[in-house]
């Protein structure tokens, strides 16, 4: 007998091995119809057809469960393959993973796909779903899978199998009628679960993400549990399109990018004002938190990057240059430079912690296809800081950073923060004991702050685990921004030492920290978060003074000068245009305040105040308006 325990504590007994679907049928036909997969003993997910061969706790996954989304999306990727192979038999399928809010499938085809092809593929998927067919899984011996894909000419599937270790002797093959694909699963048992999907776009990609390899075509899509969720997502995409930082950046004349410098930003005067405002704010954070601001070289001999470990773990993403028979690397990270500053002179344990901060300009050789406005660039500047401390000081330093980061995010208008700990990856420096200590220190610090967090196994940096801060924006999207990482490795590799209380030389612990991360990316996120309607303290132009007629020209200039003297960013609009035209123009430019001056305002020494949201605040004295502006300043 096999006993299956359900989430409500009830039990069902079966004569022998039983599938998830059979358990669902035993409970009721309604549940069986809704069953997508199962979760065994609170662990991994399995297909509805998988057998349970021992006493177990079972949670049946239906479209109501969050876990169902990834299963639906992965199954939709296979459905893309089914449709593509029916329409374009010569195409070769590569790989189709789940991504945030959707999925993609990489395909090799000599014939470039067009928007019309995308529509045809989507229509064929709709037709296949309407056939309401079962998705059938077979565990198949490796040699049989190789034979199957050889017969079908699926060269990329064969390459994927070649990359698997010898321990993989069998794998799951999923049958969508005549189409087959390999996967760990689980997948939906029937295509009726895939109705709420939409193909969104086609882009280029490369095999294994390497530009030296052949180019592929990537079909993106999104899929949800029901039509209502899909419609809500598509509405969010429309909202995001309106907030696209590239469009707003052009309209507001903030920045541009061009072909001669892919992934490198040209900042215009208004955009640079925003940059400087944020930089000054972060500089104040450095100062108030005991950081010494420094500046390190842009290029350093590769020998330093070899010592630091970046050469072995990161060289594919680095730029290099040669001079006088020496090879230099353009820095992709700031940390080795900060260690060099620490190494100038011998430190006592009484000196620790020592905190350095830098607006460090870095360059990384990102694939051209991955570049995206300000959000993914090759040249960027980080609010990068490093803390050199003892093991006993880790918890207090991480705790202080955590509280500091939350205040910064609140000042920039982010209140919904998710905290995650990224744990040791397979490819890493150091021994397991050091990683155990580092991960325990991060958990202890967050426990001291009484916050909840999620753990991400395998997603830490190669030199240490990290805390990540994920911020939700105005339309519900989540962005990963700040990090603090424990690093027991780099100080030792680069010879950083201090003298402890026993007069012994020791390597300090190094904490890598950033609150906003890439300044470019952060500004891109802010543009989209605020939809270009900047809070007054961040706005490149905070106030425009506009006259109604030439009779107020001199008074408008006096108002302008009075506000400039208070340190505000003020322009005048003294053109011979109708005041309604001026109001519309500056409202579209999202200038927070427009001060209209006519004969009445000139006579009374006041200004008529309007906001970019078209709110009329009436007449104010200049001093009253100054007080209002000062109350809105953060830095």
From Swiss-Prot:
Subcellular location field: Cytoplasm
Q: Which residues bind Zn(2+)?
A: 335, 386, 512
Query: What class does this enzyme belong to in the EC scheme?
Result: ligase
Q: Does the keyword DNA-binding apply?
A: no
Q: Which CDD domains match?
A: TGS_ThrRS, ThrRS_anticodon, ThrRS_core
Query: Which BP terms does GO give this entry?
Result: threonyl-tRNA aminoacylation
Q: What does the note accompanying the cofactor annotation read?
A: Binds 1 zinc ion per subunit.
> InterPro entries this protein is in?
aa-tRNA-synt_IIb, aa-tRNA-synth_II, aa-tRNA-synth_II/BPL/LPL, Anticodon-bd, Anticodon-bd_dom_sf, Beta-grasp_dom_sf, TGS, TGS-like
> Tell me, what's a Pfam family for it?
tRNA-synt_2b
Q: Tell me where in this chain the TGS domain is found.
A: 1-62
Molecular function GO labels: ATP binding; metal ion binding; threonine-tRNA ligase activity; tRNA binding
Q: Which family does it belong to?
A: Belongs to the class-II aminoacyl-tRNA synthetase family.
Q: What does this protein do?
A: Catalyzes the attachment of threonine to tRNA(Thr) in a two-step reaction: L-threonine is first activated by ATP to form Thr-AMP and then transferred to the acceptor end of tRNA(Thr). Also edits incorrectly charged L-seryl-tRNA(Thr).
| Name by which UniProt lists this protein | Threonine--tRNA ligase
Which organism is this entry from? Answer: Xylella fastidiosa (strain 9a5c)
């Amino acid at each position: 007998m096999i006993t299956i325990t359900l989430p409500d504590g009830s039990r069902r007994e079966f004569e022998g091995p039983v599938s998830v679907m059979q358990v669902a049928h035993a409970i009721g036909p309604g549940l069986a119809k809704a069953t997508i997969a199962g979760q065994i003993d609170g662990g991994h997910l399995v297909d509805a057809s998988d057998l349970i061969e021992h006493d177990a706790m079972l949670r049946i996954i239906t479209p109501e469960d969050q876990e169902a989304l990834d299963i639906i999306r992965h199954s939709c990727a296979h459905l893309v393959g089914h449709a593509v192979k029916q329409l374009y038999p010569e195409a070769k399928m590569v790989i189709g993973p789940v991504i945030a809010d959707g999925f993609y499938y990489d395909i090799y085809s000599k014939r470039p796909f067009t928007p019309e092809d995308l529509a045809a593929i989507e229509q064929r998927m709709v037709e296949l779903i309407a056939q309401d067919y079962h998705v059938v899984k077979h565990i198949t011996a490796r040699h049989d899978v190789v034979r199957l894909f050889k017969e079908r000419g699926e060269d990329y599937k064969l390459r994927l199998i070649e990359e698997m270790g010898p321990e993989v002797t069998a794998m799951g093959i999923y049958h969508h009628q005549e189409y087959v694909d390999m996967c760990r699963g689980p997948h939906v048992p029937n295509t009726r679960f895939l109705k709420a999907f939409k193909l969104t776009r086609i882009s280029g990609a490369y095999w294994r993400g390497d530009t030296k390899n052949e180019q592929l075509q990537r079909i993106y899509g999104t899929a949800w549990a029901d039509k209502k969720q899909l419609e809500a997502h598509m509405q969010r995409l429309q909202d995001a399109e309106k907030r696209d930082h590239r469009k707003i950046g052009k309209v507001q004349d903030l920045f541009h990018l061009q072909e001669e410098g892919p992934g490198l930003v040209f900042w215009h005067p208004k955009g640079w004002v925003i940059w400087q405002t944020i930089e000054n704010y972060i500089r104040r954070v450095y100062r108030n938190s005991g950081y010494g601001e420094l500046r390190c070289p842009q290029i350093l001999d590769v020998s330093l990057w070899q010592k630091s470990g970046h050469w072995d773990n990161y060289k594919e993403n680095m730029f290099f240059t040669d001079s006088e028979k020496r090879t230099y690397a353009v820095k992709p990270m700031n940390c080795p430079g900060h260690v060099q500053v620490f190494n100038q002179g011998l430190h006592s344990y009484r000196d620790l912690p020592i905190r350095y901060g830098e607006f460090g300009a870095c360059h990384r050789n990102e694939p051209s296809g991955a570049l995206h406005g300000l959000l993914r660039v090759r040249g960027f500047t980080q609010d990068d800081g490093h803390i050199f401390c003892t093991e006993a000081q880790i918890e207090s330093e991480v705790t202080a950073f955590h509280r500091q980061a939350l205040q910064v995010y609140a000042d920039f208008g982010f209140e919904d923060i998710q905290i995650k700990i990224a744990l040791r990856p397979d490819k890493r420096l150091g021994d397991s004991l050091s990683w155990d200590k580092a991960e325990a220190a991060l958990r202890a610090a967050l426990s001291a702050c009484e916050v909840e967090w999620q753990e991400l196994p395998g997603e830490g940096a190669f030199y240490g685990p990290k805390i990540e801060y994920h911020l939700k924006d105005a339309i519900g999207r989540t962005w990963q921004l700040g990090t603090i990482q424990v690093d027991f490795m780099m100080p030792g590799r680069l010879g950083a030492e201090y003298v402890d209380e026993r007069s012994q030389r020791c390597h300090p612990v190094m904490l890598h920290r950033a609150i906003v991360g890439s300044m470019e990316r952060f500004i891109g996120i802010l543009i989209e978060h605020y939809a270009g309607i900047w809070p007054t303290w961040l706005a490149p132009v905070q106030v425009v003074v506009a006259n109604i007629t030439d009779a107020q020209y001199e008074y408008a200039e006096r108002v302008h000068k009075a506000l400039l003297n208070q340190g505000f960013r003020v322009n005048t609009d003294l053109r011979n245009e109708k005041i309604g035209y001026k109001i519309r123009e500056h409202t579209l430019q999202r200038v927070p305040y427009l001060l209209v001056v006519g004969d009445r305002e000139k006579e009374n020494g006041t200004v008529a105040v309007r906001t970019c949201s078209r709110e009329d605040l009436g007449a104010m004295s200049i001093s009253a308006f100054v007080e209002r502006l000062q109350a809105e300043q953060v830095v």
